[in-house]
Design a protein with these regions (language model features):
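Helix-to-loop junction immediately C-terminal to a conserved catalytic motif
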Residues: 73
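Conserved ABC transporter NBD signature motif
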Residues: 81-92
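ABC ATPase NBD coupling module
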Residues: 90-107
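Q-loop/switch helix immediately C-terminal to the Walker
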Residues: 112, 118-131
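Conserved ABC ATPase "signature" region
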Residues: 137-152
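Conserved ABC ATPase signature
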Residues: 156-164
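Catalytic Walker B motif of ABC-type/P-loop ATPase nucleotide-binding domains
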Residues: 181-185
């Protein structure tokens, strides 16, 4: 299992079939002790994100945007309140359940991307693809062509521009099965043309999987047809 830029092994099943089941996320009075919470649509509220819907969360610097995303992904646990996926508290997941959940139910693009700097772009993507066996290598190359990064695939990540790295991270996130996609400022270093290309590809994959999208950003945007917008 790939978590950020670390690899963990999980038990292999004889048949690792991909099933896209719906998932509802519920936040119950979620709060971060070290954050000054003022007027927020999320913190210390009861909020539900419905399966298959797209949500935009506008957040200023220092309001806990990345902390929220990391809490939803289960790597930030310094909070009060509850994060529920289909009514199950993620703090109560066993190690095996967490690995299976991250491998088949939830995918993420971190703000800092968490790519392997010394690996090529292709290797970074293929680690996720090979671990989950969701898409063929041909499909991965098709995504790279769509996002205009085919020419970067055999280059080390450390030689790529940040915008190119963001597109590689997006492709990597799409290489696994998921019912929830978390995007933390995914387009911050992309121009409008490349944002349109990336958002089109993401929207196609969301529709295919009937997946929920949670996107955080510093500003409002209309990259997707959002069902609801929040201010953090």
């Amino acid at each position: 299992l790939l978590i950020g830029n670390k690899i963990y092994k999980r038990k292999q099943k004889k048949q690792d079939k991909i099933t896209f089941t719906t998932m509802i996320i519920t936040l119950q009075k979620l709060n971060i002790p070290f954050l000054p919470i003022l007027d927020s649509d999320i913190w210390n509220k009861h909020v539900s994100f419905k399966a298959g819907n797209k949500y935009h969360i506008k957040a200023s610097s220092g309001s806990g945007k990345s902390t929220l995303i990391q809490s939803l992904y289960g790597i930030q646990k310094n909070y009060t309140g509850d994060v529920l996926f289909n009514q199950k508290n993620i703090k109560q997941f066993s190690v095996e359940e967490t690995c299976e959940w991250r491998a088949s139910k939830i995918s993420i693009v971190f703000q800092d991307l968490k790519l392997f700097e010394d690996k090529t772009a292709l290797e970074n993507i293929d680690i996720k693809r090979a671990l989950t066996n969701t898409y063929t290598s041909e499909k991965m190359h098709e995504f790279a062509e769509q996002l205009g990064v085919s020419h970067t695939l055999n280059r080390p990540i450390q030689t790529l521009s940040y915008g190119e790295r963001q597109r590689i991270a997006i492709i990597r996130a799409l290489m696994q099965p998921f019912t929830v996609l978390l995007l933390d400022e995914p387009f911050s270093h992309l121009d409008q043309h490349n944002i349109q290309l990336a958002s089109k590809l993401i929207a196609q994959e969301l529709q295919l999987r009937n997946a929920t999208l949670l996107l955080t950003d510093l500003e409002d945007d209309n990259h997707f047809q959002y069902h609801q917008k929040f201010s953090l």
